[in-house]
Amino acid sequence: MPRRRKIAKRIVPGDPIHNSIHVQMLINKVMMHGKKSVAENIVYRALDVAAQRLNREPVDLFEQVLRNSSPTIEVRPKRVGGSTYQVPVEVKSDRRIALAIRWLLTAARGRSGKPMHERLALELVDAFNNTGATVKRREEVHRMAEANRAFSHYARF
């Protein structure tokens, strides 16, 4: 247990165009080497392309993508006696969104051949339609949790 005071959670302000905290989190994750304007350009272009393909508002589309790709349950290692069990635990809401954004970017960066805004737009469209690598990753995490359901009685953190 930490002996120092609890560190206050950093509050992320909304992005300049849509005033959405989640879009700003995506921009911050896309950003490399402190180049925020480049990251904003990538994210806004990707949201516009995806929104155009699906005839939706960009922020509504992104919120739906986060709902489709965020995990509700995951496994955490818990050492009991001499062995380590993978214990399924519920994911807190902040971590859900962070994982969904991280997986979305990993999947978009894993695609090849196109500029980043197009790869991100394609991944957004796939996640909106409940297909693609991001949703597959969520299903994989849920499968792991379901397979280790027998150890759920250890989940007393």
Curated annotation (Swiss-Prot):
Gene3D superfamilies, sorted: Ribosomal protein S7 domain (1.10.455.10)
A GO term for molecular function: rRNA binding
The keyword tRNA-binding is assigned to this record: yes
GO terms under cellular component: small ribosomal subunit
One GO process term, biological-process aspect: translation
Pfam name, any one: Ribosomal_S7
Keywords per UniProt: Ribonucleoprotein, Ribosomal protein, RNA-binding, rRNA-binding, tRNA-binding
Family annotation (InterPro entries): Ribosomal_uS7 (IPR000235), Ribosomal_uS7_bac/org-type (IPR005717), Ribosomal_uS7_dom (IPR023798), Ribosomal_uS7_dom_sf (IPR036823)
Subunit structure: Part of the 30S ribosomal subunit. Contacts proteins S9 and S11.
Family, per entry: Belongs to the universal ribosomal protein uS7 family.
Function: One of the primary rRNA binding proteins, it binds directly to 16S rRNA where it nucleates assembly of the head domain of the 30S subunit. Is located at the subunit interface close to the decoding center, probably blocks exit of the E-site tRNA.
Protein name according to UniProt: Small ribosomal subunit protein uS7
Encoding gene (name): rpsG
